[in-house]
Amino acid sequence: MKINQNTTVDCGNLILVPYQKCHVLKYHNWMKNEELQELTCSEPLTLDEEYQMQASWSTDEDKLTFIVLLNENDEAKKPSILDHVKAHSVESMIGDVNMFLTEEYADGIEEFDDSPSDANATNATKESEVHIVGELELMIAEPQNRRKGYGTKIVDAFLHYVESSGIAKNKQILKYRVKVGSQNKPSIRLFKKLGFSQVKYNAYFDHVELELMRTS
């Protein structure tokens, strides 16, 4: 999103910055890893395609992306939002956190009669039944940085930014959702710790869906 192009979320030892051109090469090298491709349900891209993707993400109004940096010399602190991109080394990158905005109809909406005589009433009903879901994705790329509690802090800081910046209100987000492989117990625990509840199991993809309703 354009809204976070000049933003840093500073948590001391963890720093969130917008995905920039300087990050692409390291990100591309990460995504050559077959395990990460499987965990993120991603297909490998060429380097040129990765640069095109970064440029697209920076202006996409339905996708919010931050690169996560690790600064082991600083202590953890509550997230603060800065109106500039903090100077940093690309070598400090450890992952990313994203949110996609999607429209969703309430259960049963497809059952309405769409005959011409009922068109106006149906359209009005459908409009009122559509809500926005913020679907989150978290990746910590390298194993040595996993299971250290970073993921919980990253998602917490990300949601703090989405709420306090006004994005959640302006985009009329009703709830947050995450999809996690059913065997990825650490990630499931992470999101449950942050208040997410499991709402669905998808047997075809073998993943669970967890959701968190917004409170304001």
Swiss-Prot record:
What GO molecular function annotation could you give as one example from this UniProt entry?
A: N-acetyltransferase activity
**GO CC term (a single one):** cytosol
Name the principal localization, coarsely classed: cytoplasm
| EC number annotated for this UniProt entry | 2.3.1.-
Q: PROSITE patterns per the record?
A: GNAT
Q: Which UniProt keywords apply?
A: Acyltransferase, Cytoplasm, Nucleus, Transferase
Q: Which residues form the N-acetyltransferase domain?
A: 68-215
Q: Where does this one sit in the cell?
A: Cytoplasm; Nucleus
Q: Which InterPro entries match?
A: Acyl_CoA_acyltransferase (IPR016181), GNAT_dom (IPR000182), NAT9-like (IPR039135)
Task: State the family it belongs to.
Answer: Belongs to the acetyltransferase family. GNAT subfamily.
Q: What is this protein called?
A: N-acetyltransferase 9-like protein
Organism of this sequence: Schizosaccharomyces pombe (strain 972 / ATCC 24843) (Fission yeast)
